[in-house]
């Protein structure tokens, strides 16, 4: 586990992300993937590792915790412990044809926060959480 506010190398952070994803039964062996899929997987792993490198995120077993850039009252961090069917069904609550709202509903549900809380986050925080959604949805 990476301790908060401790900066680590890119390689170590990416290794933590790979271990986290493997713990959730997500294949991260890019040697067996098509070139385009491997490139996309590596880009997502790098994006998820960046907050770890900067000490803003931690991984503890099967839990990824992101410290928010702009805390919202008591909400100072958001944790993700895996994707559930419940998170997927949240997208149906969004208006038909509004892809961003559908993605936001899924991200909010997977992090167990409200859609309103998600909407108040800086785009940088949303993009980290959206990358988690992408990798879990593609599994």
Regions found by a protein language model. Name each.
Residues 1-77, 82-93, 116, 121-139:
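Charged interaction scaffolds used for protein-protein
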Residues 86-110:
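A hydrophobic, small-residue-rich beta->alpha segment in the mid-to-C-terminal subdomain
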